[in-house]
């Protein structure tokens, strides 16, 4: 409105600006001119001694004619005089504002309108009042400057009130010593300019508002046409200003008690508008009528401090500006910290969402890159690009993402069984480090590598027997992805190397930690020691229902559940897909046998996975395909689980043999109990 700020006020508002602008409010408030204000508004008994001096207008007892009337209740006449003066303030305020809306600044017109609305009398006291006011202006200016707070009202109010109140009731002491010409010596425009410059210094908006409502002197500079109640002695006015300044510093609540005309809504808005900047000192005189009584803005300025706002007026949460205060931070948390906190929370939320939406293989790839970026180059160089198998594996991974198990996706690798079996883990390690010299050399090195590092990037694809790789790749990937079948601890870690991503790393797939208690890792798991031989994984997916039943029966404590597997028709294709929840709820297995079965299946698939379904997704080496039995028999049996010792201290029985029965006994290894000596079932 007056300063170009968009103000949103209720349809019926008592603020000064709305009185001017709204015809509805003008008409409604015009009725208030004749309605007596309640005593609570007019008589502020709690006022400080600055207001306690006797009125001085009726009995002349006061030292000056400018004492605020009736605030210290003395007798009936004083109270009546004060009421009339307060009403006069209302009248002059409304009438002058109506005139100012039309840019009519003619003081005589306003005064005459006031005279008409109020039955003013005693015009003969004008000269005395002017004279008295002139003297008071001279005396009060230094006192007002001390605080730098010019608690002034617009000249329109002062001029109108002066004439009407001077005419109404003047004490005989108003005609004292000063010559009459001192009174009208300052023009209203000059006085207003001085007021505007004073207000622009450091005053809060409430100061002029409060004085406007109470009819207090506007900083002692009021020209002689100010009304008598404005003129207090300099020491009294200084006390008034000090009190107002202290109230403004305490916050809006300190001023609310002293605003006689402020309704609850207006007090709230004034509280919001605390510490408003004063009007521009260079304001043009044309806007003088509308600049001073500016309505309290509904929106707080950007730099307004927010500590004084009540909790019900503050923004609802951190970092979120609202219409009431547009700075994100307030009170206990500075804006910068609030913004940083909100930014961090949003970043975490986005990262979590992205992690949930990422396909398993992409997530695994990202984890691997972040964990071992230096190993990715050799891995990619060594890994043959088999588009068909890669697509198949990715499809299996996505299908198996259904479980809540960690996303342990297998990296895409070349066909696993493309090469002969890996004779020894040591040789296998050497081969991948060399860059996969030859299928044969890579196989021996891979066997060691599988056990020790479980590197999928090794030439293990060549090392694995083709038969194993065909069905086992997708299946193993699926199992690894699923990761919920802890009982499926990888038994053919060496075979997984063929698909392994890291050719030269001793840790499986660049695990950030050497051995984690959360992973059930045998030699197959890729955590096997250098001397261990990784058991070759076998193609579980080719098992029949009888093979699965024999495998389950060969596991200690699981024989009683073979009937359930047979009834449900679980074969090699579906066995790796069984989650712990399926085994426990749908098939009625107990926790121990269920975990054991899943661990053994995982071992046969050459997969290491987190038995406890830890939510963190960790890259794991894909299952290594074990060499065919014939190849194993040729002297490459070191790959069998029997030779390979699990990190838990037990050697694993030969897992490389294709028959599940043989591996059942040997692979029935739980994280703490590998049984290398178990007979092959």
Swiss-Prot record:
Q: Any keyword Hydrolase?
A: no
Highest lineage ranks of the organism?
Eukaryota, Metazoa, Chordata, Craniata, Vertebrata
Residues covered by region (Disordered)? 41-77, 212-234, 251-307, 407-498, 625-681
Comp. bias intervals (Basic and acidic residues): 219-234
| PTM annotation (Phosphoserine): residues | 640
UniProt keyword terms in alphabetical order: Disease variant, Isopeptide bond, Nucleus, Phosphoprotein, Repressor, Retinitis pigmentosa, Transcription, Transcription regulation, Ubl conjugation
- Name of protein: Sterile alpha motif domain-containing protein 11
| Organism listed in the record | Homo sapiens
> CDD domains of this UniProt entry?
SAM_Samd7_11
Cellular component GO terms, alphabetical = nucleus; PRC1 complex
Instruction: State how changing residue 45 to E affects the protein, per the record.
Output: In RP; uncertain significance
């Amino acid at each position: 409105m007056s300063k170009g700020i968009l103000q949103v006020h209720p349809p019926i508002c008592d603020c000064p600006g709305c009185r001017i602008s709204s015809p509805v409010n003008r008409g409604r408030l015009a009725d208030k001119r004749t309605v007596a204000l309640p005593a609570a508004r007019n008589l502020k008994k709690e006022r400080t001694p600055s207001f306690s001096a006797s009125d001085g207008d009726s009995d002349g007892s006061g030292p000056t004619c400018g004492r605020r009337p009736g605030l210290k209740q003395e007798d009936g006449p004083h109270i009546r005089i004060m009421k009339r003066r307060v009403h006069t303030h209302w009248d002059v305020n409304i009438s002058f504002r109506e005139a100012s809306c039309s840019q009519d600044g003619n003081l005589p017109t306003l005064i005459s309108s006031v005279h008409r609305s109020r039955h003013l009398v005693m015009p003969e006291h004008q000269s005395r009042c002017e004279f008295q006011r002139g003297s008071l202006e001279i005396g009060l200016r230094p006192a007002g400057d001390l605080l730098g707070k010019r608690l002034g009202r617009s000249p329109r109010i002062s001029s109108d009130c002066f004439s009407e109140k001077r005419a109404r009731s003047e004490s005989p002491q108003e005609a004292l010593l000063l010559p009459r010409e001192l009174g009208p010596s300052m023009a209203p425009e000059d006085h207003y300019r001085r007021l505007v410059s004073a207000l622009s210094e450091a005053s809060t908006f409430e100061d002029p508002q409060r004085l406007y409502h109470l009819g207090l002197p506007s900083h002692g500079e009021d020209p002689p046409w100010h009304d008598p109640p404005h003129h207090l002695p300099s020491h009294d006015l200084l006390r008034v200003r000090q009190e107002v300044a202290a109230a403004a510093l305490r916050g809006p609540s300190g001023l609310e008690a002293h605003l006689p005309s402020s309704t609850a809504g207006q007090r709230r808005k004034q509280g919001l508008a605390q510490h408003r900047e004063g009007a521009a000192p260079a304001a043009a005189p044309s806007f003088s009528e509308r600049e001073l009584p500016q309505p309290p803005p509904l929106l707080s300025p950007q730099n307004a401090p927010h500590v004084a706002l009540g909790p019900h007026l503050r923004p609802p949460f951190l970092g979120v500006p609202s219409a009431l205060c547009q700075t994100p931070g307030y009170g206990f948390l500075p804006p910068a910290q609030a913004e940083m906190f909100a930014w961090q929370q949003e970043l975490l939320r986005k990262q979590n969402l992205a992690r949930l939406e990422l396909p398993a293989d992409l997530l695994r790839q990202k984890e691997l890159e972040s964990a071992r970026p230096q190993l990715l180059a050799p891995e990619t160089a060594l890994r043959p690009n088999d588009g068909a198998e890669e697509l198949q594996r990715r499809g299996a991974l996505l299908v198996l993402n259904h479980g809540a198990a960690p996303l342990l996706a297998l990296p895409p690798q070349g066909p696993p069984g493309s090469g002969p079996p890996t004779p020894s883990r040591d040789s296998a390690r050497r081969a991948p480090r060399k860059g996969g010299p030859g299928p044969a050399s890579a196989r021996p090195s891979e066997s060691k590598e599988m056990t020790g590092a479980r590197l999928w990037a090794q030439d293990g694809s060549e090392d694995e027997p083709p038969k194993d790789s065909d069905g086992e790749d997708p299946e193993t990937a699926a199992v690894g992805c699923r990761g919920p079948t802890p009982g499926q601890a990888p038994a053919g870690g060496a075979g997984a190397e063929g698909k392994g991503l890291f050719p030269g790393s001793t840790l499986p797939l660049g695990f950030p930690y050497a051995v984690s208690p959360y992973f059930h890792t045998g030699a197959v798991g890729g955590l096997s020691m250098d001397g261990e031989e990784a058991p070759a994984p076998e193609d579980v997916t080719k098992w029949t229902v009888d093979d699965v039943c024999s495998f389950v029966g060969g596991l200690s404590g699981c024989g009683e559940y073979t009937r359930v597997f047979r009834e449900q028709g679980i074969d090699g294709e579906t066995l790796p897909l069984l989650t712990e929840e399926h085994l426990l709820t749908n098939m009625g297995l107990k926790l121990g046998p269920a975990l054991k079965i899943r661990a053994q299946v995982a071992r046969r698939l050459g997969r290491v996975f987190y038995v406890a379904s830890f939510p963190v997704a960790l890259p794991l080496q894909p299952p290594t395909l074990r060499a065919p039995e014939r190849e194993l028999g040729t002297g490459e049996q070191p790959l069998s689980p029997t030779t390979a010792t699990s990190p838990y201290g037990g050697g694993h029985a030969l897992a490389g043999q294709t028959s599940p029965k043989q591996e059942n006994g040997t692979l029935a290894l739980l994280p703490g109990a590998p049984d290398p000596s178990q007979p092959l079932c």
